[in-house]
């Protein structure tokens, strides 16, 4: 049973998304929403993210929107270390803090500031071991930062009842085509 879902994927810059106006962002959010609604109908209770900019924060925005219709849904933000946002641009920090303050649970794997890249790998292991499944926006044909997490999740899924779900480039393309068809149909 999937009650705790870890959501992760590409960072915004890996997808070439630098602002809210990028048309690809709406497609990614629609894909996330579609999957989350499907899981909510199967008793999903928690969405867990680490607060990484990109897919994780877009998933958090989607969760906050879905909470209006699914009030039992909860958002957990478990960062790898304390104050991960402190070196980001002020505007980005404000965006991050606005979302994180609305989470139902906030914590850090390490109760210290950044000490090394190893904390990121340990964060992935921690979140995988404290969730029932992962939804990963990742396409193996377009490698990026989620590659390591994808391999860890696949290994865990192969050796247990852990569930690995992916949204890949083909899924996103299908949603883009649906939107184009809707626009076309609406024009008549």
From Swiss-Prot:
Cleavable signal peptide: none
InterPro entries given in the database record: YspA
Family annotation (SUPFAM superfamilies): MCP/YpsA-like
Family: Belongs to the UPF0398 family.
Protein name (Swiss-Prot/TrEMBL): UPF0398 protein BBR47_29830
Organism: Brevibacillus brevis (strain 47 / JCM 6285 / NBRC 100599)
